[in-house]
Design a protein with these regions (language model features):
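Bacterial N-terminal signal peptides
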Residues: 9-18
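Bacterial N-terminal signal peptides that target proteins for export
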Residues: 1-8
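Glycoside hydrolase catalytic-domain context in secreted enzymes
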Residues: 22-462
Length: 462
């Protein structure tokens, strides 16, 4: 069981730098704690012993999870006790790619009042029918943003989403995330938000060619401010794979083939994104300018057999003809997991689709990294002591039966799965009475909460 100290409370609403633009009010408690409330959510401020609190579940009283004076452990335990199996499952899910406004055809298409956007009369910042469904019916809170009409539209959409979910159930906020978006050109689904009207920077190899970690850290600090202004609190980056296979088409997005250089650059990137400046810091490096960094791809996505990428079956194997497996994990274990700043480590890590061929010397299984007890539990969790969030690659398990999936969730030691909600429901049903998911309260929910609470919404940050 992961220790409770890593559980961060979910029920403190997100702030963005654009909160003044919509119906959001702030109140300051006697001790100086600032709370933000969406006027349309139905959530009210209550006073207890002269201090102010948000009545997130709207029951007219102060519950322990709403009391910012209590410890992380006390608040988390109370929140977990109030959550249903379905809500727990929702916190372990990620949305499909969401463009703002939603596209009208193809992957990720959406509607507004059952009409395509162009015919709906809706504002570009409105919440689509599909978004309302996964937020309300599926209890999903981790949302992946791609292209947005403008920064203003993105900020307003975020505020609309936060107002919507604040009025649902326990008031758990949305954790909006993004693949890298500060480059000039969209090349694939994993940088579909690039090319927007924010600062534009070189991609990985070009940044690596500067040999300047300080510059990369500066980029992280600037990009984090932009992300927060857009309402984004998790960066699905950096990509700290080693570029050891020149035929791999994702090599342009890595810093180098050198373990030492990638370690230094990746560490600087995470420090820049996660650590708030002195005036913006609230606690332990986290603050109003912090964005959670999800490093990828554990245990290294670079050694693709023949350069064929793991997004496709033809590239399913990661191979190590020079037996350099340990070089590929060095940017994680000696860089992203050992930060100098107050946040200490990257908030999350993503394993790659690939099968790390013949690396499992305990269970002797050649399975995808996200399904490998050896890669995730024995190495990442136990040997290297990583206790942050582990999030699978997108749609890594679309062809698995619920029996396989149940074992994957139960034994894989993962926190987020990029799978359809129906798969979690099926797994729960397969377990008979939902016991499998209930057992994940202390593990999955605890780490999932880091991402939602990892910025200024972290319980330790008020």
């Amino acid at each position: 069981m992961r220790q409770k100290k890593h559980i961060m409370l979910l029920a403190v609403s997100l702030f963005s730098s654009t909160l003044f633009a919509q119906n959001i009010k702030t109140v300051t408690s006697k001790s100086g704690t600032v709370l933000g409330v969406n006027k349309g959510s139905g959530v009210k401020i209550i006073k207890v012993e002269g201090e102010k609190f948000k009545d997130l579940n709207q029951n007219g009283k102060l519950d322990p999870y709403e009391d910012w004076r209590l410890s992380v452990e006390e608040r988390a335990k109370d929140l977990a006790s109030k959550m249903s199996v379905e809500q727990i499952a929702g916190l372990m899910l990620y949305s499909q790619h969401q463009s703002i406004p939603a596209g009208e055809v193809g992957f990720g298409a959406g509607t507004y009042n059952e009409k395509p956007f162009s015919e709906s009369g809706a504002e570009a910042s409105a919440i689509s029918d599909q978004q309302k469904k996964f937020l309300k019916e599926d209890d999903l809170r981790h949302v992946l943003l791609t292209a947005v009409k403008s920064p203003e539209v993105a900020a307003k959409w975020n505020n609309n989403v936060q107002a919507y979910v604040e009025g649902l159930g326990l008031g758990i906020p949305a954790n909006n995330s993004s693949d890298p978006r500060n480059t000039a050109t969209v090349t694939s689904e994993f940088n579909a938000g690039a090319g927007g009207t924010i600062s534009l920077w070189p991609d990985g190899l070009a940044m690596g060619a500067t040999f300047d970690p300080a510059l990369v850290k500066q980029f992280g600090e600037m990009a984090a401010k932009e992300y927060r202004a857009l309402g984004i609190t998790t960066a699905l980056s950096p990509q700290i794979d080693l570029g050891t296979e020149p035929r791999w088409y994702r090599i342009a997005y890595v810093f180098s083939e050198s373990p030492e250089l990638v370690k230094a650059m990746g560490k600087a990137y995470v420090e820049g994104f996660q650590n708030s400046g002195k005036d913006a810091e609230i606690n332990n490096g986290w603050g109003y300018e912090s964005v959670n960094a999800m490093v990828k791809h554990w245990p290294g996505g670079g050694p693709e057999e023949g350069g064929r990428d793991g997004h496709w079956a033809m590239g399913k194997f990661a191979v190590y003809p020079g037996d350099n497996f340990n070089d590929h994990i060095k940017p994680f274990t000696e860089g992203a997991f050992k930060l100098d700043g107050g946040t200490k480590k990257a908030a999350a890590v993503m394993p790659y689709y690939t099968i790390s061929f013949d690396r499992d010397d305990i269970y002797n299984e050649n399975v995808g990294n996200g399904f490998s007890k050896y890669i995730i539990t024995e190495l990442l969790r136990d040997k290297y002591g990583y206790d942050g969030v582990v999030c699978t690659e997108d749609r890594c398990n679309t062809n698995f039966s619920c029996t396989h999936e149940e074992g994957f969730l139960d034994e894989g030691n993962l926190d987020w799965t990029c799978v359809p909600p129906a798969l979690i429901t099926a797994a729960s049903a397969a377990s008979g009475n939902g016991e499998m998911l209930e057992d994940l309260v202390d593990e999955g929910v605890g780490s999932c909460s880091i991402q939602i609470e990892g910025t200024d919404i972290k319980i330790a940050l008020g």
